Each structure stands twice: as structure tokens, then as C-alpha cells.
Amino acid sequence: SNPSSANVIAASPWANGFYGSPGVSGMLPAAYTLLGRRFLSSVQKAGLENQITLKEWRKGTVNTPDGWTYHAKGIWVTLKDEAGPSVSLIGSSNYTKRSYSLDLEANALIVTRDVGLMRRLKEEEEWLQEYATKVDQGTFEKTERRVGFHVRIAMWIVTLVGGAL
């Protein structure tokens, strides 16, 4: 048995910066919904649902008073009996061909034994968790989470052209 566990936090559709935007970009929150659903299916097929949890982050609704977008990216690793993460990967972790070709991407790997820094990293992780809610396949079956045919076709096209984007 593997005692390790992982929480994956993604933006809820209502915390996605493209929520409600006109045109093709407005399809992105639904596309991420479909990807989340597929991710959970893969977790279940691998028999890892007791070790890997998918959560969605939401603090209000974007473009409304007090609505926040979610764009946090990172990995926080806390070893057993530690005050907080001793390993953290932070940065602009976009790993697509487009990102490698056109964007400047940077990451930093932090490895620490400093208890104060570990506690601060833990506080950051806890703040993210505070606004994150566990999702399951039932979440994606709700009417407001249905992904339209046009989004599915667009994702299929993106898969075909792949790295050209």
C-alpha cells in the first residue's frame, strides 16, 4: 500500500479568467471542466481515488465584486512529521510547445529545512485549500457543468493540431 496522497487544485469555471468571455476563449472554462472529468476517470481507472483528490478553487465569481480568479501553480511536498512543505516548485509551469517556443517560462525548486519557511509554505497551501472544494464525477454531471458539443469538437481539433498551438 502507498501511504502517499495528493490534492490537485484547479480553477472552478467561476474562477477561470475566461469565464463569461466572448468568443472562443469563453469555451475554456468548459474545456477545463471536461479535462477535470477525464482526469478523475483516469484516477479511478488506476484505482487511486483514495490517494488523489481533485479540488476546484473558487472565491466568488470572476468579474463580479469580490470575485477572484485562480492562477496559482505549484507543488508543495510535505514529508511525514514535518511542520510544512520542505520541497516546493513554484513558477509559471506551462508545459506546452507554445510555452516553450513563444513564452518565457521560469520555475524555482525550493528545498528547505528552515522551519519558519516550511510554516509559511504551509500557510500558503492552507490558504489555497480554504477555497478549494473536492469534486467528483457527480459534480460534473450537474446541469451547470455540462460541456457542450461545440467545446468537445474544439478540443478534438486542438488535439489534432496539437503542438501548433
Model-derived regions: residue spans:
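PLD/PLD-like phosphodiesterase catalytic module centered on the HKD motif
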Residues: S1-L165
